[in-house]
Amino acid sequence: PKNSMRGRNNNGHITSRNMSGGGHKKMYRLVDFYRKKFDVPGTVERIEYDPNRSCYIMLIKFDDGTHFYYLAPQKIKVGDVVENGSAKEIKVGNCMPLRDIPVGVNVHNVELQPGGGGKIARSAGTSVTISGLDGNYSLVKMTSGEVRKIDSRCMATIGVLSNPDQKNIKIGKAGRSRWLGRR
């Protein structure tokens, strides 16, 4: 678990005030935002809660025996097969370059530089829409309405992220905020 010092030094004295502290201990799950396992199909083994992020994560077992955690999109279920790489089927959970994704499809975990790992649309219920192609670039419409020009070799995952109702959760009391490590 990640150590939560929150403004205290090794003697326990406050060295930086106004930092939130405490909260329930969290085990960090290593989520793969790069999705570099190309052309090997993988099966969704389970979908899990992750205390470190707002959306759910899925454990994928690839045919060569390796396991990875990925962000779980909506409408994916245990037993579904997902693949990474170019010219694959346009199916929820598949990851491919922006140039291979048709216009109007919702995607998440979008890279900003080829091979840089997903940076855009990683929070619960979010996605961006492919709105067009411009030479070697893809036009991507963000949830804010902004249209960004991103290199077409950048990878993105098909689908909208899970847990869209996360924004409607009521904290209810001050103590629950403290459980979450917020002040």
Question: Which residues does each PLM region occupy?
Answer:
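Beta-strand/loop nucleic-acid-binding surfaces
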Residues: 65-77
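Short, flexible active-site-proximal loops enriched in glycine and acidic residues
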Residues: 51-58, 67-70
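Short, structured beta-strand/loop micro-motifs enriched in basic residues and often containing a Trp
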Residues: 61-68, 86-92
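Basic, glycine/proline-rich low-complexity segments that contact nucleic acids
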Residues: 1-53, 78-183
